[in-house]
Structures are given as structure tokens and as C-alpha cells.
Amino acid sequence: MNPNFLDFEQPIADLQAKIEELRLVGNDNALNISDEISRLQDKSKALTENIFGNLSSWQIAQLARHPKRPYTLDYIGYLFSDFEELHGDRHFADDPAIVGGVARLDGSPVMVIGHQKGREVREKVRRNFGMPRPEGYRKACRLMEMAERFKMPILTFIDTPGAYPGIDAEERGQSEAIAWNLRVMARLKTPIIATVIGEGGSGGALAIGVCDQLNMLQYSTYSVISPEGCASILWKTAEKAPEAAEAMGITAERLKGLGIVDKVIDEPLGGAHRDPASMAESIRGELLAQLKMLQGLEMGELLERRYDRLMSYGAP
């Protein structure tokens, strides 16, 4: 199976294979088969619209983890100019699972911070599969406090299975680092916009997710635990992950309905990985509009709005 397609996309993959086969035949025999190719392309588009119009929560979770899905550094390349990455937490080390630095969005200075997964095996290991250790969160905190000092808005990109649960991370204060970030972000005197671009896993996501405006891409997820983890606890088997995904309400539309997410940003047909440039432009438009709105607020009003937003979560 084509690695760019997930299991539920197999009918689309089969059609695409036929289209490619016809193109090769046409090139070899100089036959005019453009009409047949156009017919199959229309059929593929209609099939894609039908499949993606009826996705389950589990299928959306699979899309959020797609190996070709754009990561933070991809969006930084599309959205920002003059990006200068900053390293280290000034306590222990630098954590490649979180990237951050100063940049310009349409000429205006901003602080950009986000989780970063890897593509190839070596990079996946170096970035710990996007699971930060305490030094990653402390680095993020350092950059956010710097942004406040220099009056720069903060833009975060969330994409992590969760904070790294290893012994070394716990020994260095993983839970304290996350809790400290929540405290600091709740009080920062600068606008904060967070965007979930893939997986939003538990406290590992929330540690850079306290914000004035929360966006989610259409096929991203946000949850307190992975579907597999939830299924292993409730049903004693990860095979119940599809049921767990549905029960937890991990999708953007579901969370928008609960008032947790402010904006769901539509993805290109087939997902962000099908057209990263178009996806980035959609994100750019939302970020610029939201920044304009937030920067128009008095600081006291901004902080009160953030406090009210946080306190509105949960049952009354």
C-alpha cells in the first residue's frame, strides 16, 4: 500500500494507482487518454469527499498522526520570515522535541514555539518522537518570558503524543515543569495564540497551550490520554482504541461544541499533508485576524478574558 494513504483511504489509493498507470501508458504509446484520466480524477475527488465527509474519531486520530503531516518547522518555513531558533533552558540542556525562537509574521515580531516530531528514524530518536522532557518545557517558558519582556505576541504549535514519561524526565521534575508553565502562561502580559496542528496529548500539549485563543486544525486531536491508553485502562486492550476515541470526544468539532476550542481551521481535501502550502495560508489568515483582535485589547482586559476563559472549563 502507498505509505501516503491510510487504511481507510485504500479505495482512493487504488484509483490514484490506476491514474498513474494510465499516465505511464500514455507516455509510452503516445495515446490520448486524457479523457479517461479526467474521469478517474473526478471519481477520485468525489470518493475522497465522501470518505472524508464521514470520518470517525479514530480515523481523524490516524490523520493527526500521518507521517507526512506538516510539523512545526514546516509551518515556520511557510508562515514566518527571519526565524532565529533559540536553544536551551539555562538549567540542564536543550530539548529538540520543542523548537522555538523569534520570527516575523507579515513583518511583525513574534515568538514562535512548538513541538517537533521527526521524519527519518534518526531524527525521530533525536526529537524523542515529539515527547518533550522537562528541559523542553523550561526552554519554552524561558522564551515566553522573553516574549513578554520584549512585548512580542506568542504563537504556539501543538503536536505531541504527550510529555515523555521516562525515569530521567521524572527525576528532573516533569510534572513541576508542566505546572510551572501553566502558571506562567496564565499571567503573561502578552497575547498568546495556540494552534493544535496534529496530536494534542494531555499535559504535554497543555504546557504550551494556555492561551487567549485556541485553534485546532480540522483533522487534529486534543485529549487527556491517547485512545490506545484509554482503551488499555478501561477495556484492558488497545484494540478498543476506536471506541475510546469516540467516547473521549477528541476531535476539533466536538471540542468546539464544548467551548474548549475557539476556531476550527479547515484542512485541504484529504488532509494538511495533501497541500501544506494551502494549509499554511489558512493558518496565516486566522493568526493575523486573531492577533489584530487581541492586540486591540487593553492589558487588563486581555488577562481578565484569559482568566474567564480558563475558569469556564469543566462542569458548572
Curated annotation (Swiss-Prot):
Pathway: Lipid metabolism; malonyl-CoA biosynthesis; malonyl-CoA from acetyl-CoA: step 1/1. It is found in: Cytoplasm. Pfam families: ACCA. Its EC number is 2.1.3.15. Residues 39-293 form the CoA carboxyltransferase C-terminal domain. It is an enzyme of class 2 (transferase). Inhibited by pyrrolidine dione antibiotic moiramide B (CPD1); in vivo the effects are not seen unless the efflux MexAB-OprM system is inactive. Its main location: cytoplasm. GO terms for molecular function: acetyl-CoA carboxylase activity; ATP binding; carboxyl- or carbamoyltransferase activity. PANTHER family: ACETYL-COENZYME A CARBOXYLASE CARBOXYL TRANSFERASE SUBUNIT ALPHA, ACETYL-COENZYME A CARBOXYLASE CARBOXYL TRANSFERASE SUBUNIT ALPHA, CHLOROPLASTIC. This is Acetyl-coenzyme A carboxylase carboxyl transferase subunit alpha.
